[in-house]
């Protein structure tokens, strides 16, 4: 097959029977068609593959042209935070629940995948956020987020106080359960559950969504994605186990008086889709919107 992709990485959901079946089928399909197939180490161990083509996510990103992620959106998010640092295209086979980011059905993924491998696909780039925690002016920790960065308390049902600055300008102070800073990709995730607006993927925008604020006037706001969001945590907070959560998978410790900077990352996730992909079809299907009347 004459393909724009020569080296393909397989990344998956370890110890998941359905995902393992799909990964095994993909490995056989790709190797018999002459592709160089690299396998994520956790997946390889589960499938019993032990050779020089087994490697970690960073090595996969350095060597692969295309990465196929088999699992749910959580698996895609974990892989995407690493793969976004490299010029590698990513497509997903859904073996999770909603599957906003994993286009291909596990029942009939071969035909659309074959079209993608032959060079017939749609391509898009999704920006990520970078969240960093500063303490007494020193950068203590940082990470990337595909969906959202969330400041939240460490104690259940315990409000925290903080100030919000946009590009250095004070916006408001807030007493709440925290705040969500979401990308367009993340606007259909935690942000949506908290009452935030859905942002279409091509928008250069982010949304700030308060979490149970102790006021009737605080509402979500949409900002230019090139804005720098600064959260100044009140030193009077009694909770010393606060966190910034990136995609619900990576946590950064936050203490009273800390400062959190959230801004658009220089890294982008390169997604590829089948030619019949439609973002609004995905929304309609995943969120249960009404179908056409006539």
From Swiss-Prot:
The keyword Cell division does not apply. Pfam families: NAD_kinase, NAD_kinase_C. Gene3D superfamilies: Probable inorganic polyphosphate/atp-NAD kinase, domain 1, Probable inorganic polyphosphate/atp-NAD kinase, domain 2. The active site is at residue 73. One of its GO terms (cellular component) is cytoplasm. It comes from the Bacteria. The keyword Nucleotide-binding applies. It catalyses: NAD(+) + ATP = ADP + NADP(+) + H(+). Its cofactor is a divalent metal cation. GO terms for biological process: NAD metabolic process; NADP biosynthetic process. Keywords: ATP-binding, Cytoplasm, Kinase, NAD, NADP, Nucleotide-binding, Transferase. Its main location: cytoplasm. Belongs to the NAD kinase family. HAMAP family: NAD_kinase (MF_00361). This is NAD kinase.
């Amino acid at each position: 097959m004459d393909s724009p992709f020569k080296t393909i990485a397989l990344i998956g959901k370890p110890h998941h029977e359905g995902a393992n079946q799909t990964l095994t089928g993909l490995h056989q399909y790709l190797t018999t068609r002459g592709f160089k197939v690299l396998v994520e180490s956790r997946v390889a161990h589960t499938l019993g593959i032990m050779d020089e083509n087994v490697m970690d996510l960073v090595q996969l990103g350095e060597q692969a042209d295309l990465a196929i992620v088999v699992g749910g959106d959580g698996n895609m998010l974990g892989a995407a935070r690493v793969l976004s640092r490299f010029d590698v295209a990513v497509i997903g086979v859904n073996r999770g629940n909603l599957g906003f980011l994993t286009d291909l059905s596990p029942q009939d993924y071969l035909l659309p995948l074959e079209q993608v491998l032959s060079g017939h696909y749609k391509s898009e780039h999704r920006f990520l956020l970078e969240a960093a925690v500063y303490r007494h002016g020193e950068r203590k920790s940082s990470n990337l987020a595909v969906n959202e960065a969330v400041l939240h308390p460490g104690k259940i049902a315990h409000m925290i106080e903080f100030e919000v600055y946009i590009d250095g300008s004070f916006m408001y102070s807030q007493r709440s359960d925290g705040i969500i800073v979401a990308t367009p990709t993340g606007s259909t995730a935690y942000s949506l559950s908290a009452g935030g607006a859905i942002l279409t993927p091509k928008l250069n925008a982010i949304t700030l969504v308060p979490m149970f604020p102790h006021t009737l006037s605080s509402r979500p706001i949409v900002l230019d994605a090139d804005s720098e969001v600064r959260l100044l945590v009140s030193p009077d907070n009694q909770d010393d186990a606060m966190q910034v959560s990136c995609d619900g998978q990576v946590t950064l410790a936050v203490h009273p008086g800390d400062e959190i900077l959230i801004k658009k990352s220089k890294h982008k996730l390169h997604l590829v889709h089948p030619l019949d992909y439609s973002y609004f079809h995905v929304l309609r299907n995943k969120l249960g919107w009404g179908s056409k009347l006539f």
